[in-house]
Amino acid sequence: MTLSTNHVYPVIWHNGAVSLIDQTRLPNEYTFVEIHRSEDMARAIKTMIVRGAPAIGVAAAYGMYLGAREIETSDRHEFLQNLDKVAQLLGSTRPTAVNLFWAISRMMKVAKETLGTVEDIKQTLFQTAQAINVEDLQTCQAIGDNGLTVLPASPEKLTLLTHCNAGALATAGYGTALGVVRSAWREGRLERLFADETRPRLQGAKLTAWECVQEGIPVTLITDNMAAHCMKQGLIHAVVVGADRIAANGDTANKIGTYSVAIAAKAHNIPFFVAAPLSTVDFELADGSKIPIEERDPTEIYQVGDTILTPEGVDFYNPAFDVTPAELITAIITENGAIAPGELVKLQLKQLV
């Protein structure tokens, strides 16, 4: 894959290892972490060195290959048993992002169906991981361009709002929600992006704003509780967010706070779009009520650096995601086009590999 200096690539295979942009250090430090072992990849996913559902999927695919590379046996049955343990390790890291499980499942399926020696299986797994990487980049570019077809026709230059980071950092490159933003900017349809800071980990402030600055896209950062006010003031023409898991009926799990933004958008008659690849759709879930919601360490809420923000004796609740009901979503923008949430099931066959 040829890398462009204009875009960010958070997951790169280089010299026999995976190079990850350390997203926990942005925007102050732009550094890479080299991953050589599956255990290290699992830790990187868990600690959010790499994050964003599609990027997690790509990282997990490479993690499966790294795990396969570590298995020292020529016996096919023993190899597959050990590879299943690698799959379980990676699958235990982030419960909400369905792309993680999609990538692991695809890699396991390839391993079981590949004929030949264990070394043949390992080589095929590597090729599959690289294919998943390239496919996601192409998918994001298609999502971005498909988003142009459903954005409001007027005004000519739009002000969009996004929540969290569904950009190049959250994918193989280009982004889903920010893919739409990038395409709108490229075509002269974007005036400005408003970015929610996205408490408690501040992905909007640290990551989305950083991406926009790198490419010269005008961006205004607001706190999460300013979104409804900005809508009331007529500052927002449409909302575009990403997704970590979408149920068959269109209910969408995304970063905590997305549901609040969707409610505000509905109240102000502002279109609310979800941009995500079909690999993010979990057709086995009829609706969003069964989507597992990750709960993270409460230190994300009460501590910034070495500073404690709250008094002792306070209890904390820190869900990482919420579920936006399908009826609040104007359209879901996929690589196969933009569709109403209720029509999502019609694309199920196109998701199959």
From Swiss-Prot:
Source domain of life: Bacteria
GO terms, molecular function: S-methyl-5-thioribose-1-phosphate isomerase activity
InterPro entries named in the record: IF-2B-related, IF-M1Pi, IF_2B-like_C, Initiation_fac_2B_a/b/d, M1Pi_N, NagB/RpiA_transferase-like
Residues with site note (Transition state stabilizer): 164
UniProt-listed SUPFAM superfamilies: NagB/RpiA/CoA transferase-like
Functional pathway: Amino-acid biosynthesis; L-methionine biosynthesis via salvage pathway; L-methionine from S-methyl-5-thio-alpha-D-ribose 1-phosphate: step 1/6
GO BP terms in the entry: L-methionine salvage from methylthioadenosine
Binding site for substrate: 51-53, 94, 203, 254-255
Family assignment from sequence similarity: Belongs to the eIF-2B alpha/beta/delta subunits family. MtnA subfamily.
Name the UniProt record assigns to this protein: Methylthioribose-1-phosphate isomerase
